[in-house]
Amino acid sequence: MAWNRTSVACSALCAALSACVAPRSIGVDAVDVRLVAEDTTWRAAYLTGQQELPTGREVHVPVGADVRLVLTSRTYISDFRLPELGLRDFAAPDLPSELRFRAARAGRYDVRGDELCGRPHTEKTRGWLVVEDAASFQAWIRKQRRGSQQ
């Protein structure tokens, strides 16, 4: 009898602890974006199944969506910052990293970056994160798809 209670208590404790340390999952309303640093520029591409949708230096996401940014670099180690959202990470060749977040309010946020080579590239590595309502996001995606097919 004591053995069963102990087993149940241990199982419950393990489940509670794993819930605390498990990474937040990407939900149904998720946006996956690959950001690639190359020389002095960030390039964004939405990961949509088997295809990528390139969008340049601007990333749009709907308010409240789970967002996963996959960072990598083709050339140097690069710094990626979204200071208004408290996000920062590094992109390195052959070493992808991820940032996950949920943007709670609409707005246009500055993406800042810098190559870690000592030369100033702030303006060239700048980009934008646009957080908007779902209808505006879908309209923007449709516009990007039309542009990529031309």
Label the predicted regions:
Residues A2-S7, S11-Q150:
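Non-transmembrane, membrane-proximal soluble domains of secreted or membrane proteins
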